[in-house]
Amino acid sequence: NSWEKALQDGWVEDENLFEIEEAAHRGTIIQYLLSDAGQIQAWPTVEANLSKGDALYFSHGFGIVFHEHTSIVPPENVDVMLVAPKGSGLTVRTHFQAGRGINASFAVHQNFTGQARERCIATAFAIGSGHLFETTFEKEVHSDLTGERCVLMGLLQGAFLAQYEVLREHGHSPSEAYNETIEEALQSLYPLISERGMDWMYANCSTTAQRGALDWAPKFRDTLKPVIEDCYQKVISGEEAKIAINSNSKSDYRQQLDKELNDVNNQEMWVAGKVLRQLRPENL
């Protein structure tokens, strides 16, 4: 658990590692970084130990924006701010350990002291976020939840699986279907997008690939945009938040999640991927 990980990382109990109640009482900038469901559960304890002038710091706007579902409503005599790194917690940590940062958005929800913005930006620098862009709690959570459900995760898995299944149904081997769907994307094409943009990736592919991609991209946009709009509306209405809270608050949540992830792991597409990853030059 997180307590054991903290001990392994060198934190010392009763010196700089405390239970939530004690940490909230001692702190002046309280970084509230539990899971969304965990924040709901711990909020009465944290709220009771906030002091006038404290700063309540979030990395995600979920608890504040969907307060009708979370009951997280901070007192008026504290600053409420957000720094949302554009990556997973694991990425933030590994980049920090390597002396690198990760882009982040920041927002001030409540400025009791008159210094909330300065405190927010200073804390962002402290975690290694050198490039910041300002947003609001609402915009952060609405874009974040939409991105996770669509292009960043949900749509990505769905699109990968759809193409893989089409290729397999037309007689292509698992290896070929995986390579043409995922391996080439991750190893060759996506790094080019990251390096200099989509046009750079197009420019470094064959003319046949360029023509096909340019012709088909608008068709996918027109097909997918209504689905993404539907997702966005469900996010801003709070429907997706309610689903997440109800699911993640169940006593068997972890067991059910493990089952769902195991089902993904055992899909033929990803089984083929395990074999192919082992054949990458760096793994031989």
Region annotations inferred by a language model:
Residues 169-284:
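NAD(P)-dependent Rossmann-like dehydrogenase/reductase catalytic/cofactor-binding core
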Residues 57-149:
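Rossmann-fold dinucleotide-binding core
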Residues 7-65, 73-88:
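Rossmann-like NAD(P)-binding element
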Residues 3, 23, 174-178:
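Small-residue helix-packing motif on alpha-helices
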